[in-house]
């Protein structure tokens, strides 16, 4: 697959460090691609878990992936404001099948009031031992937690006040075509 164009759809596949498929999102609409990043939107998107369970996303969400940073960001647009779910994960790759990354368990959730929570530390520690995460991965992930918190605190990139509005409006324009 070449670089997807604005308005096209991609599948997103999340893997675990041991190589098994963790979760799949069908039909994420691409809003923008650049040399290093992809911005898309999920809106009532079918999600399939590794155990076969399926569910559909409840609200629109702007997704941000980068080829250099070890995280991806989901901005969920809800009635009470935007909530962010940030996955500590490998940089993404794109092939003929899907956009793919490795999920490293740690997550940061940002609530509409700005409260931040680091989630799934126990899961990270368990999988780190079970799947034998290398020390350099542990170091990279911890450094990227710092980068992510800096972005959140300084409203950089997907955390800027205008970001969600701009990309949600673009999604609405594209979905009317």
UniProtKB/Swiss-Prot annotation:
Keywords: Hydrolase, Magnesium, Metal-binding
Pfam families registered for this protein in UniProt: DUF402
Entry's Gene Ontology molecular function annotations: magnesium ion binding; nucleoside diphosphate phosphatase activity; ribonucleoside triphosphate phosphatase activity
Binding site for Mg(2+) 1: 87, 103, 107
Names of required cofactors: Mg(2+)
Family to which this protein belongs: Belongs to the Ntdp family.
Protein known as: Nucleoside triphosphate/diphosphate phosphatase
